[in-house]
Amino acid sequence: MYRFLLSRQWVITTLVALLLIPTMIRLGIWQMHRHDERAARNDLVAEALAADPVPVRRLTSPGHTVTTEERYRTVTAKGHFDTDDEVVVRRRTNGNDEIGYHVLTPFVLADGKVLLVNRGWIPSDPASQSAFPEIPAPPRGETTVRGRLMPDETTEASGIKDIEGLPDRQIMLIDSEREAERLDAEVLGGYVVQTAPEPAGGTPQQLGNPGRENAALNLAYAIQWWLFAAGVPIGWIVLVRRESRDRTAAAETDEREPTESEPATV
């Protein structure tokens, strides 16, 4: 009854089914790993945002690489803004996907070391991408700032290419080591996204809290792949039974049909 399974067509179909099952299982396992990674990152971000503010010097220093556990921690610093050496970070968007700049201002601490502060987003001038934009001034004199500690930006992590030959005082990526060379000063590793004090008039537009990654979507994909893997053998069995029924029905029809040597019954 099932000798047809030895035919070329059915051997190929069976081999394809046997290959699909482990492939789909592995894809489901990969999606589960992605789910676990995203869930772990969400937990780290939530813990960092909920932690009490600490002085920035407790978490970073010149040459320090901000770790995953330190990222998004709320820090404070006392000093003054140096707008003479302020730069803007190109091709940054706000919540409405409008393209503009991030304003990066050196913040000089009492001991002369520098903390890079991202004061927020401003729109770019469509008529000129090379002219330095007008930037609202920060508070004058000694100020205490608060914000989220962030690691230096890289092309690998951000997907943003570091273009050379940019107009004066414009950069693509926030890199504390490069800024230390430009400023000829000791710059603390990473930078701070300012959350307080709020700017006068609401500009620069301060950056919102990081969003949660959709880990549940990866879980749904994993379950979907495993259901597909379970469906392959079920589908194979359904096809085999259908083929067997069709062949049996065809054989019974052939048996009922009269041969050429036998007259049909009237």
Language-model segments: residues:
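Phosphate-centric recognition/catalysis
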Residues: 65
